[in-house]
């Protein structure tokens, strides 16, 4: 039986999926750049302790702001 996810884990997963969905709204030739950036950003904090709630909440706020920025149609590429 799979382990149930906590509220923060669900929020992180939602942020990741929303980020990938946003990346797929960009031009085909630049989507890989966005997806690579997302993987790098999430990978940086992969080993963050699950009990470090304040850091996780801060990173969620920062991530949501980045999604809002990346969702603008004027932004077509990221390096």
Curated annotation (Swiss-Prot):
Keywords: Chaperone, Mitochondrion
GO annotation, cellular component aspect: mitochondrial matrix; mitochondrion
Main location, first listed in the record: mitochondrion
UniProt-reported outcome of changing residue 61 to P: Abolishes the ability to complement a yeast strain carrying a deletion for this gene
Pfam families: Complex1_LYR (PF05347)
Outcome when changing residue 63 to R: Abolishes the ability to complement a yeast strain carrying a deletion for this gene
Keyword Mitochondrion in annotation: yes
Single Gene Ontology BP annotation: mitochondrial respiratory chain complex II assembly
Top-level taxon in the UniProt lineage: Eukaryota
Mitochondrion among keywords: yes
InterPro entries from the UniProt entry: Complex1_LYR_dom (IPR008011), Complex1_LYR_SDHAF1_LYRM8 (IPR045295)
Subcellular location: Mitochondrion matrix
Mutant phenotype after disruption: OXPHOS incompetent because of a profound and specific reduction of complex II activity.
Subunit structure as annotated in this protein's UniProt entry: Interacts with SDH2 within an SDH1-SDH2 subcomplex.
Function: Plays an essential role in the assembly of succinate dehydrogenase (SDH), an enzyme complex (also referred to as respiratory complex II) that is a component of both the tricarboxylic acid (TCA) cycle and the mitochondrial electron transport chain, and which couples the oxidation of succinate to fumarate with the reduction of ubiquinone (coenzyme Q) to ubiquinol. Promotes maturation of the iron-sulfur protein subunit SDH2 of the SDH catalytic dimer, protecting it from the deleterious effects of oxidants. Acts together with SDHAF3 (SDH7).
Protein family membership: Belongs to the complex I LYR family. SDHAF1 subfamily.
Misc. comment: Present with 861 molecules/cell in log phase SD medium.
Protein name in UniProt: Succinate dehydrogenase assembly factor 1, mitochondrial
Source organism of this protein record: Saccharomyces cerevisiae (strain ATCC 204508 / S288c) (Baker's yeast)
